[in-house]
Regions:
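Short amphipathic alpha-helical segments
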Residues: 14-15, 51, 300-303
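Conserved alpha/beta catalytic core and glycan-binding cleft of carbohydrate-active enzymes
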Residues: 12, 20-185, 189, 198-202, ...
Length: 356
């Protein structure tokens, strides 16, 4: 069950927040609901914001609004967002203590039924709710969206290519982040609400899912399927899986230089490496996610590997996705560990064994 504006259930008779709200505690320990997932939208209409502090009793998970906001800002190139983005990708330990709640408490998302769809997030800078009947005064004004140079629908091939890459960047990062991943139905094939970010009152083509777009945006659909399968095949992306045999730490943070975790206001390129064991515990499972939100090409250095192992690029959003694409051959390499990333792109690589 997901509870809309759940923080209202934690207010006292006078409206003040309670530390142990009886209704939330009852739901947490109810024997009939013992095997049911309880998910809170951890804020309410009165301004109470409890992301990271919702009364949980280790039973409630939360929609992580910080994940949405921080990653949207970082991915579109805002300054000073690199460290926050890293925290979100690693499971938001600053919000959900690993000792008490951990990654299972965070439901990561970038889009939901409230706000822009993923397609609209990179097509509109401003909401367009005129058809709702309130002179465009309803809906949130703080969308952290970016239209990639033109407002609304575009015929410019450069704008369209950039929007396509930005959508893939967002979905790839979501699927490579610790915690539960959630995306809005229709985002996998670029459903649009035509810039309306408050479409609850529209029972028409504004809020309906247009299934014809599945064919029109089949390349995005296949990319999303690929990323979902990648997440399933690599449990290290979802949580701890035991120490790796090669001695790498379970998680490590990098900027454009391997093992250099320094971030500042101007940092736009980050790398995150997860190292552990595969699902059958037969070999190491090591995944690296590189994110370049800068508007220029950037060289990124992957960690040097032990003898007999190499990096293989699985995803590179610079290139279109097809079923038989080999990103490893397409990706610009200067050496075994030095790669060139195009502006505003994401790559995912894994460690493979090789024998000469």
């Amino acid at each position: 069950f997901r509870f809309d504006l759940a923080s209202i259930m934690g207010r006292n008779e006078d409206g003040s927040p309670m530390s142990k709200p009886p209704i939330l505690q009852s739901l947490a320990f109810d024997p009939i609901l013992g095997r049911v997932k309880l998910i809170a939208e951890a804020w309410d209409a009165g301004g109470l914001y409890q992301v990271g502090s919702f009364p949980a009793w280790n039973r409630w998970s939360e929609w992580n609004g910080r994940f949405r906001d921080d990653l949207r800002c970082f991915l579109k190139g805002d300054y000073g967002m690199a460290q926050a983005a890293i925290e979100r990708i690693l499971g938001s330990a600053d919000l959900y203590s690993p000792e008490n709640r951990g990654e299972n408490a965070t439901v990561n998302f970038l889009n939901c039924h409230d706000g822009f769809t993923l397609y609209d997030m990179y097509a509109y800078n401003w909401k367009h709710n005129e058809k709702n009947g309130w002179n465009n005064t309803d809906g949130d004004n703080n969308n952290n969206s970016w239209n990639c140079g033109e407002e609304g629908e575009s015929m410019n091939p450069e704008v369209l290519a950039l929007r396509n890459r930005m959508r893939k960047n967002s979905f790839a990062v979501l699927m490579c982040s610790r915690g539960a991943a959630m995306f809005l139905a229709g985002d996998e094939f670029c459903n649009t609400q035509f810039g309306n970010n408050n479409a609850y009152c529209q029972d028409n083509e504004i809020s309906w899912i247009d299934w014809s777009r599945k064919e029109q945006y089949s390349e995005m659909f296949e990319f999303c399927k690929f990323m979902i399968q990648l997440r399933k095949e690599h449990p290290i992306l979802r949580g701890r899986s035991g120490p790796s045999g090669c001695g790498f730490p379970e998680v490590s943070v990098h900027n454009s230089k391997a093992w250099n975790a320094e971030c500042n206001q101007d940092t736009h390129t980050i790398g995150v490496m997860f190292a552990g064991r595969n699902a059958s515990n037969t070999e190491d499972d090591i995944i690296y996610i590189g994110v370049n939100t800068f508007w220029e090409y950037c060289d990124i250095e992957l960690p040097k590997l032990p003898l007999g192992r190499k990096w293989k690029v699985l995803v590179n959003t610079e290139f279109e996705h097809t079923q038989d694409v080999d990103y490893d051959l397409l990706t610009r390499r200067k050496s075994d560990i030095l790669l060139t990333m195009c502006p505003r792109s994401v790559l995912v690589a894994r460690v493979e064994k090789y024998f000469e």
